[in-house]
From Swiss-Prot:
Name of the featured protein: Large ribosomal subunit protein uL29
GN (gene name): rpmC
Pfam families the record matches: Ribosomal_L29
Keywords: Ribonucleoprotein, Ribosomal protein
Leader sequence segment: none
UniProt organism field: Synechococcus elongatus (strain ATCC 33912 / PCC 7942 / FACHB-805) (Anacystis nidulans R2)
GO cellular component: cytosolic large ribosomal subunit
């Protein structure tokens, strides 16, 4: 899975952006839970999810 491009995020509508932010936060929570219970098989997903969340939050902040 490649890291997402910022241009893809900038093309989202405000509603889609808010939905993607909530989705990324939930996924990060699930990954933390899996790591705590030693069920995480792909630790690189932390980096990808955090990167995607940072991009989403950056674009949200730019629009304010």
């Amino acid at each position: 899975m490649a890291l997402p491009k910022i241009e893809d995020v900038r093309n989202l509508s405000d509603a889609d952006l808010a939905e993607k932010i909530a989705e990324a936060k939930r996924e990060l929570f699930d990954l933390r839970f899996q790591r705590a219970t030693r069920q995480l098989e792909k630790p690189h997903l932390f980096k990808h999810t955090k990167h995607r969340l940072a991009q989403l939050l950056t674009v949200e902040r730019e629009r304010q």
